[in-house]
């Protein structure tokens, strides 16, 4: 009973390819279980889909969301690694983006979140994207409105995405559109 029931329900949902904790576990059990809540008056986003994951990352580009986590609660720690700071080479342009340690930026990054150890090639444009760990993006490449999964390589001259559709790119390149 209690948390054991929650874990069982969570495992059942995963086998059914359902990952929405709020709808699949909390709301589904509201009439049969005692559920206690805490009124949260700050930022919250239910990450139950790829779109939700993308939106949550993009929300961190808003000063009020970023400030809530990093100014109001400055003791948020992530995994400690001994990485150099991000490097912005001559000709690079970055606006309204979060660039993590170990990244090398040679191109343009706009409205994007770039996780650690990513490489952005010369004359490449990254726009409205989430670039995960250890991604290599070659020269003269455009990545727009995409999530690029960890350890992916985007070859020079490739163009992924457009402003109307969210795409997920993996190690073997294009995975699916949403």
Q: What do these predicted ranges mean?
A:
Residues 12-178:
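Left-handed beta-helix
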Residues 2-7:
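Short, small-residue-biased leader/transition segments that mark boundaries at the very start
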């Amino acid at each position: 009973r209690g948390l054991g029931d929650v874990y069982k329900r969570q495992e059942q949902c995963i086998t059914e390819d359902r990952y929405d904790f709020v709808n699949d576990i909390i709301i589904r059990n509201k009439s049969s279980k005692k559920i206690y809540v805490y009124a949260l008056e700050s930022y919250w986003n239910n990450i139950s889909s790829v779109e939700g994951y993308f939106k949550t990352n993009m929300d961190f580009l808003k000063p009020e969301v970023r400030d809530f986590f990093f100014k109001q609660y400055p003791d948020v720690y992530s995994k400690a690694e001994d990485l150099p700071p991000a490097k912005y080479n001559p000709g690079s342009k970055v606006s309204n983006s979060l660039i993590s340690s170990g990244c090398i930026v040679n191109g343009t990054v706009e409205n994007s979140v770039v996780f650690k150890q990513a490489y952005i090639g010369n004359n490449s444009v990254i726009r409205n994207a989430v670039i995960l760990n250890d991604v290599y993006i070659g020269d003269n490449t455009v990545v727009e409105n995409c999530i690029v999964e960890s350890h992916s390589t985007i070859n020079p001259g490739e163009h992924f995405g457009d402003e109307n559709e969210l795409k997920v790119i993996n190690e073997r390149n294009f995975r699916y559109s949403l």
